[in-house]
Amino acid sequence: MSQPQSSQVTKRGLTDPERAAIIAAAVPDHALDTQRKYHYFIQPRWKPLSEYEQLSCYAQPNPDWIAGGLDWGDWTQKFHGGRPSWGNESTELRTTDWYRHRDPARRWHHPYVKDKSEEARYTQRFLAAYSSEGSIRTIDPYWRDEILNKYFGALLYSEYGLFNAHSSVGRDCLSDTIRQTAVFAALDKVDNAQMIQMERLFIAKLVPGFDASTDVPKKIWTTDPIYSGARATVQEIWQGVQDWNEILWAGHAVMIATFGQFARREFFQRLATVYGDTLTPFFTAQSQTYFQTTRGAIDDLFVYCLANDSEFGAHNRTFLNAWTEHYLASSVAALKDFVGLYAKVEKSRADRSRRRLRGAAASSAIGRSITPDKIGFRVDVDQKVDAVLAGYKN
């Protein structure tokens, strides 16, 4: 049988009228918490606070010794050798707040999946109409079998390699908004690779004997001099770099902005219609949309947040300039190899004049893509274009 509580035990509890009165008297007569918004700790980029920011910011553990973090303490688990789950030593760049970055497109999981679903539906409608119209008959067989199937097919390995380069970025980056930008950019790259193979498989269904296997494109990517420089650059970014900021900058601000844009837009997309190919531009247009979306996010991260950081801006621009110098040289070498592909297309159809190529290389591949004024980088465009055109063969 339970024993009744003593008066001493009872007086220790909050039910004791005397103690309750003391507590009530000590409570201020004004509101204890004047901040009634749940996300008061998020600094909004836009007004009001966007859904993207509410669902993205500070989801990742954020100790205060990582700039911008709001928590405290150390990690309960670490990698072998003592490396922390996340740490400032993962990059050479510095900032007063890693959580300042915002994707201008405000992409998070739901709108990203929604956009991809819409793309899949209109792609299905386009391919059904293309097949029904018999539009495949307008493609020049040489372009279809030799250039499109083999060399455009080989480009998927460049896209896939750059996709894989993001794997460590998605793990090591120091804020959740940067992680979303990196992961969505990575998924767009693998989407590009899949679209190239989708086009080849689609053609194989319409053209008897068309080989849609990846054996020949893989051999071209790994052995053909056309892709020698591109392959070396992609391999370096993917396997030779530890700094996650360097991977993002080298890949998106330099390699993709130069070699990727020239190969995809200036060669395959521009020449496709000359050879009666209206199929390839449909897919490359989607890739160009991905490029522009990611470009806005990369610009926000590296220019707005890092190059213009109030305390570490000069430090960061030093590294961005060094990285640009290094990877621009590699990308120019890749372009020099790639323009040799013009020797495989007919002069009368390719508009292969040296002036035409010089303009394409200067304006779209080097001049506008690097945006040197934003980080203080200086480049001799004419010298770089001359280096590219050294690989041009009449």
From Swiss-Prot:
Its name, as the record gives it, is Methane monooxygenase component A beta chain
Q: What is its EC number?
A: 1.14.13.25
What keywords appear on the UniProt entry?
Monooxygenase, NADP, One-carbon metabolism, Oxidoreductase
Instruction: Offer one Pfam family short name for this entry.
Output: Phenol_Hydrox
Tell me the domain of life: Bacteria
The answer on whether this UniProt entry bears the keyword Nuclease reads no
Gene behind this protein: mmoY
Q: Name one GO biological process term.
A: one-carbon metabolic process
Q: Which InterPro entries match?
A: Ferritin-like_SF, MethMoxA_beta, MP_mOase_hydro, Phenol_Hydrox, RNR-like
Q: Which reaction does it catalyse?
A: methane + NADH + O2 + H(+) = methanol + NAD(+) + H2O; methane + NADPH + O2 + H(+) = methanol + NADP(+) + H2O
Q: How does it assemble?
A: M.trichosporium has two forms of methane monooxygenase, a soluble and a membrane-bound type. The soluble type consists of four components (A to D): protein A, comprising three chains, in an alpha-2, beta-2, gamma-2 configuration, is a nonheme iron protein containing an unusual mu-hydroxo bridge structure at its active site and interacts with both oxygen and methane.
Q: Which NCBIfam families match?
A: MethMoxAlphaMmoY (NF045802)
GO terms (molecular function) for this protein are:
methane monooxygenase [NAD(P)H] activity
What's its job?
Responsible for the initial oxygenation of methane to methanol in methanotrophs. It also catalyzes the monohydroxylation of a variety of unactivated alkenes, alicyclic, aromatic and heterocyclic compounds.
